[in-house]
């Protein structure tokens, strides 16, 4: 089986992957380096934004980082930790569903809407 490392510059994990209009879109979680202690509250995870990656050829082509598409600061009820998201298309709109902790540290599910798969 052929393998390839796609994004060496950042801490990204848990991707959802979709093909929209013949292009592969990757929606990973994005963690930031920190020195927080590992505990049951997940304080060691600083996941404060999402990036979208895409490519025409996952094994040989260039992987484009479309940059930050959603940030904790963009979400009024956000507390911390944007976990693994997923995206669905309906009627030409792209819906990103994401779990995160609110200001009371309770997990909630939110949705963001865009006109393009890259945000």
Go through the PLM ranges and name each one:
Residues 1-119:
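Carbohydrate-active catalytic/glycan-binding domains of CAZyme proteins
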């Amino acid at each position: 089986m052929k393998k390839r490392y796609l994004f060496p510059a950042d801490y990204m994990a848990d991707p959802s992957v979709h093909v929209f209009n013949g292009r592969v879109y990757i929606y990973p979680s994005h963690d930031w380096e920190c020195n927080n202690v590992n505990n049951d509250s997940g304080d060691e995870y600083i996941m404060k934004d999402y990036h979208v990656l895409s490519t025409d050829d996952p094994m040989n082509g260039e992987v484009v980082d479309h940059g930050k598409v959603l940030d904790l600061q963009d979400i009024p009820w956000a507390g911390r930790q944007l976990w693994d998201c997923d995206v669905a298309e309906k009627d030409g709109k792209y819906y990103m569903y994401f779990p995160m902790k609110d200001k009371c540290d309770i997990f909630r599910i939110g949705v963001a809407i865009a006109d393009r798969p890259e945000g």
